[in-house]
């Protein structure tokens, strides 16, 4: 499993960067929101697939089912390759890319990467530690905690689907600000000193709704902020910064939670979300001047 995880991760990262760049260049913001909405559908469906495998077969049967689904997707992509062809002007523009090193030297890119890192760090922390928060802080059973934690995924999935209908009217920047305001309201609900877990459950739904607009809008705004010729390289680095944040920051929260208390979750989340909106706003201001 460890050996196969390496090429699996390489392939997933390549698809993530390439697909996001393609949609950012050739489609509207609403399409980007709906694309990432179906990521949420996958996160909701996947536990049922593994649950079916564990109940009726073995755990590795779940991996086979997912592998078969991905093989079908790969075949569909190969069959529909002619549909993905772009016009020559766009092809020439993409060939002029400055590359990874050159992209890092563009004004505003370091701020963008820091903001994206902070967002993915906070989002993944909320995803992975919500159930533990309910158990350790609210004192409910692990089974019920897992159910309440899934509300975050529902919030982010529904939010991205709904935002697709309004994002073209408001624009990427306003959607990012709106999403940040919503998720901060959700975090404020976690600060309310109530023993009832219903408010905490509602808080994670609100945080998910707020997160819904941020990831797709940051990516979709990249070609407009830095130029289509640079978007491929920049979005690739964005994905790398996203993976760094989602890989290392949630375990850090686990260490802090065990050492101090899992009650620090709202403080932890608000730190990274404030860092995210600060860096993102700096990016938009710098690129607006340029």
Which positions does each model-derived feature cover?
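Helix-loop-helix hairpin linking two adjacent transmembrane segments in secondary transporters
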Residues: 3, 34-85
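C-terminal transmembrane helical hairpin of 12-TM major facilitator-type secondary transporters
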Residues: 170-218
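Interfacial helix-cap and linker-helix signal at transmembrane-aqueous boundaries
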Residues: 49-57, 134-135, 166-167, 252-261
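A late C-terminal transmembrane helix in Major Facilitator Superfamily
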Residues: 225-262
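Juxtamembrane intracellular "pre-TM" segments in multi-pass secondary transporters
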Residues: 84-112
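Cytoplasmic helix-loop-helix junction between adjacent transmembrane helices
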Residues: 4-38
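Extracytoplasmic gate region of multi-pass secondary transporters
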Residues: 107-150, 154-158
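Loop-to-transmembrane helix entry/capping segments in MFS-fold secondary transporters
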Residues: 28-38, 142-143, 228-238
């Amino acid at each position: 499993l460890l050996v196969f995880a390496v090429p699996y991760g390489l392939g997933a990262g390549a698809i993530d960067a390439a697909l996001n760049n393609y949609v950012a260049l050739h489609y509207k913001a609403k399409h980007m929101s709906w694309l990432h909405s179906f990521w949420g559908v996958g996160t909701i469906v996947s536990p049922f697939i593994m649950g079916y495998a564990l109940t009726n077969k073995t755990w590795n049967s779940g991996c086979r089912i997912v592998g078969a689904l991905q093989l079908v997707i790969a075949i569909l992509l190969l069959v529909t390759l002619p549909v993905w062809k772009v016009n020559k002007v766009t092809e020439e523009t993409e060939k002029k890319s400055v590359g990874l090193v050159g992209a890092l030297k563009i004004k505003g890119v370091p701020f963008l990467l820091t903001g994206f890192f902070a967002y993915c760090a906070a989002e993944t922390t909320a995803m992975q530690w919500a159930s533990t928060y309910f158990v350790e802080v609210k004192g409910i059973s692990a089974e019920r905690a897992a159910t309440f934690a899934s509300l975050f995924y529902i919030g982010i999935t529904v939010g991205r689907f709904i935002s697709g209908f309004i994002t073209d009217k408001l624009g990427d920047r306003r959607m990012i600000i709106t999403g940040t305001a919503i998720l901060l309201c959700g975090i404020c609900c976690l600060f309310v000193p109530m023993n009832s877990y219903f408010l905490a459950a509602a808080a994670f739904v609100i945080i998910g709704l707020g997160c819904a607009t941020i990831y797709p809008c940051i990516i979709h705004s990249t070609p407009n902020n830095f130029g289509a010729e640079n978007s491929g390289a920049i979005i690739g680095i964005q994905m790398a910064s996203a993976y760094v944040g989602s890989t290392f920051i949630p375990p850090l929260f686990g260490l802090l939670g065990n050492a101090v208390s899992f009650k620090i979750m709202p403080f932890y989340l608000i730190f990274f979300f404030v860092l995210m909106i600060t860096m993102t706003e700096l990016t938009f201001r710098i690129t607006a001047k340029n």
